[in-house]
Swiss-Prot record:
One of its GO terms (biological process) is microtubule-based movement. Residues 373-489 form a coiled coil. This is Kinesin-like protein 8. Residues 5-356 form the Kinesin motor domain. The lineage of its organism: Eukaryota, Fungi, Dikarya, Ascomycota, Taphrinomycotina. It is found in: Cytoplasm, Cytoskeleton. Belongs to the TRAFAC class myosin-kinesin ATPase superfamily. Kinesin family.
Length: 511
């Protein structure tokens, strides 16, 4: 067990061509010896700054390492090699010892986060350097301990709008389907990770590079905001499993450790959106970055009853070990030398993150005899898999039962409505058929109204017509005027009614 704070490194990018052309003011001063960065308010003041009530003058922040902008002509300024030397060896050593490790990049758009992680041709970043170093160290361990078996596997993902996407799945860009199986899960040895991703065993740095190229093609670049800022967080996960066999006792010890390199999504400049809203603190721009800042603030708060909002986003759920858990963590904060608001916020949160304490342990299983170890591992793996499948089946069953109940209620309502319509149509049909088979004719030759019936008598109609005999006499004159209309009134066709009923039955099958 070891206790250590999150290690925070700040890297200042050089001025951009646009900043140089505008002679933008340099607001940062880097003291690499004392490991501090001082930010000075711009000459035009802080009238429109969101930090105007927080800053009165130059402010100095202390970190574990500080790198000034790199320049080819100066050997004193940092480059990719310097950044790796201050981070990579510690990560490689930790993961091979069995400790979980995490490397996080943090900062605004265009400050060099992805460049620091991946690099360019001839200027490799953290991942290519670590890939080379880790296999070199594995070769040394195998030569030193021939009875040690070591495997390395990797996975790559991108978290976009609270949804993890597998970057090593074929055709991921065309389907745009995240897959229901990818979610954050805690493993008994390697801690919180994205479960359900494609995981591939690799044997060299070249193989890792090939998978990185595949992932780069699958990154969903269309999901970015209007300023071109990519909303996704890239997650590179490397798992090292070691099986160390004691040649005397034939007992073995299994170690498992996970290195996660997380390139956080960029946040756009506050001045390009709304100067009164912080690009760090506004959840409307990127919910997960906002939650991350709240987690950092809660972990470093002096209050004891503060709730840590890990569960408020997928990103912070994944980072539970990295921030305050079983992990050795390094944060690389990349900042701009000319932007006051976002640079000040980045430095402020990064200095706070440096106070977060992690307690890390070597991840190992109890030793078993090699004769039984494989069988026990298989049983444990099967049980874990069965438990997970049972949990997912229960969730699916609940959703299915709810869906079936909704469908049942909907169809009961439809059946009731159709039965009502059917009863009305039957009544209509009976009246129409009866009127067709038993037509009535009134003889108005004299003043006494007489009823003539054709066909077989209908007793019900007789009784009803007799009750209205007096009224019919008083309406003699009116009925005489419409006599001709009664003779011309069309008789309902039974075939037409049958057709309407059949049409209604077919319509109900489509529901």
């Amino acid at each position: 067990m070891s206790t250590a704070n999150v290690r925070v490194i700040v890297r200042v990018r050089p001025k951009s061509l646009r900043e140089l052309s505008k002679s933008a003011e340099d607001l940062l001063s880097v003291d690499s010896h004392n490991k501090t960065v001082t930010i000075t308010p711009p000459k035009h003041g802080l009238k429109h700054s969101r930090h105007k009530n927080r800053v009165n003058g130059p402010r100095t922040f202390a970190f574990d390492e500080c790198f000034a902008p790199s320049a080819p002509e100066s050997k004193n300024l940092s480059g990719q090699e310097d950044v790796y030397e201050s981070t990579g060896p510690l990560l490689v050593k930790s993961i091979l010892e069995g400790f979980n490790s995490c490397f996080i990049t943090y900062g605004q758009k265009g400050t060099g986060k992805t460049y620091s992680v991946v690099g360019l041709r001839g200027q490799p970043g953290i991942i290519p350097h670590i890939s080379e170093s880790i296999f070199e160290e594995i070769d040394k361990l195998k030569k030193k301990s021939p009875n040690t078996t070591i495997t390395v596997s990797i996975s790559l993902a991108e978290i976009i709008e609270e949804t993890p996407y597998d970057l090593l799945q074929p055709n991921v860009n065309s389907s745009h389907t995240p897959g229901e199986t990818v979610f954050v899960q805690k493993d008994s040895l390697t801690g919180y990770h994205l479960h359900g991703l494609s995981e591939f065993e690799v044997g060299s740095a070249q193989e890792i590079d090939a998978f990185l190229r595949l992932a780069a093609k699958n990154i969903r670049t269309e999901l970015s905001d209007i300023s071109g800022v990519r909303k996704g967080h890239s997650v590179f996960s490397l798992v090292v499993q070691q099986r160390i066999i004691d040649p005397k006792t034939r007992h073995s010890l299994k170690k498992a450790s996970r290195l996660q390199i997380i390139d956080l999504a960029s946040f756009s400049k506050g001045s390009q959106r709304n100067e009164s809203i912080s690009s760090f603190e506004s959840s409307s721009n990127n919910k997960s970055l906002s939650v991350l800042n709240r987690v950092i603030a809660a972990l470093t708060s002096k209050k004891n009853d503060v709730l840590i909002p890990y569960k408020d986003s997928v990103l912070t759920t994944l980072l539970q070990d990295a921030l305050g858990g079983n992990c050795r963590t390094i944060m690389l904060t990349c900042v701009s030398p000319c932007d006051f608001d976002d640079t000040f916020s980045a430095l402020r949160y990064s200095e706070a993150a440096r106070r977060i304490k992690n307690i890390s342990n070597i991840n190992c299983k109890e030793a078993y005899s090699t004769n039984n170890e494989g069988e026990l591992d298989d049983i444990l793996t099967t049980l874990e898999s069965d438990r997970e499948q049972l949990r997912r089946h229960e969730e699916h069953s609940q959703k299915l039962l709810k869906f079936i109940e909704e469908i049942r209620n909907d169809y009961e309502e439809r059946i009731h409505a159709l039965e009502s319509q059917n009863s009305a149509l039957k009544a209509h049909l009976r009246l129409a058929v009866d009127a067709y088979l038993n037509p009535l004719e009134f003889n108005f030759d004299d003043k006494n109204v007489k009823l003539k019936e054709f066909g077989s008598p209908n007793i019900a109609y007789k009784q009803e017509l007799n009750s209205f005999q007096g009224e019919l006499s008083s309406l003699f004159k009116d009925l005489k005027l419409v006599k001709s209309q009664l003779h011309d009134y069309p008789k309902p066709e039974v075939s037409d009614i049958d057709m309407d009923m059949e049409s209604l039955r077919h319509d109900s099958l489509l529901d």
